[in-house]
Amino acid sequence: MIRVSAGVVRRADGKILICKRGEGRKNAHLWEFPGGKQESGETPAECLKRELQEELLLPVQTGRILCTEEKQGILFDFVYAETAEKPTLTEHEAMAWVTPREMLRYTFCPADTDVAMRMALNDPPLKNFLWDFDGTLMNTYPAMVQAVIRAAEKQGMHPSAENVTRLMMHDLRHCVHTLAVGNGGDEEQLYADYRREEAGIPPEDIDVMPHMAEALQTLKERGGRHFLVTHRGEDAWRYLEYQGLRALFDGGVTRDDHLPRKPAPDMILHVMRTFGLCPEETIMIGDRPLDTEAGRRAGVLSCMLDTSGRFAEDPAELYAKDVENMMGLLCAEPLIL
């Protein structure tokens, strides 16, 4: 089996060297931890020293193997190293010195992605989890869509469930506005009728997202704190209580706190001020771009929990297709340098 040494090279200020693969190479234009193939008889450290001298004219002092990963039939030894010298580009098209957390801004080669993530999410470890409600914690959309349809029918509109769902994935207000304008309806009346229909949705009609209850409990047991950040009213707490999840939350904000709606950062900033949360230890998790944008604008990490499969291009630092995928990211074994 082919074996490769990849260098986690750190300089005195704590920043780590990453390099961008050049045109014509496999995984061109993606970032990597520099290194190369081990030759017969070489140790991982010896290989790394040779490769970094050849590729970057960079002398290093090597240390321990941080971890070994197998990707596509190749073993990658990630070797810790230190340097006080300046690298020179010879094969790569770019390089950067970054903090572990800054690695989340870069797209890495498949072999390097997990290692970069394990370092980035523990610099420092995440402790505070801010949750959207509708479509994130609870699968409320089927009931909400039917509430919109019933409200629209009072004005003679007959939107399809598919169209309402598509519009709601942007924002409820956007959905109501689009339906009213497109059908000559009264927007404010439609919104008011929807709210009345929504208020009548019984808790037993709302399901927890698959594996979400276990995820909340696991993060809590690992020392995490949960906070609600939702456009829904105080009934969100009632639904959480019904599902036995209310006690897992330290607090949060709802529509009834009368703060500007996401993607404005105000709701998140209010929670952070109220509970004294550190931005570097906080992440906003939601299922729509307005949630992740609110997180970015508030200066915290964001995770797109895209169970609908609609937002794969969202610029959130983390992307998960389902709750299990999300937990694989949030609970990955930390890589300590």
Where are these regions (language model features)?
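N-terminal helical cap/lid subdomain that shapes the substrate entry/recognition surface
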Residues: L126-A213
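Short, acidic loop-to-helix structural element flanking the phosphoryl-transfer center
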Residues: G200-L228, P265
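Conserved Nudix-box catalytic region and its N-terminal flanking loop in Nudix hydrolases
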Residues: K15-E55
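Conserved phosphate-coupling serine/threonine residues in phosphotransfer and NTP-handling enzymes
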Residues: T136, V229-T230
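Non-catalytic pre-domain segments flanking phosphatase-related domains
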Residues: R118-W131, I336-L337
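Unchanged
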Residues: Q38-N122
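Asp-based, Mg2+/Mn2+-dependent phosphohydrolase catalytic module
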Residues: K127, Q217-K220, G233, R238-L337
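Conserved N-terminal beta-strand and adjoining loop/helix that marks the start
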Residues: M1-I16
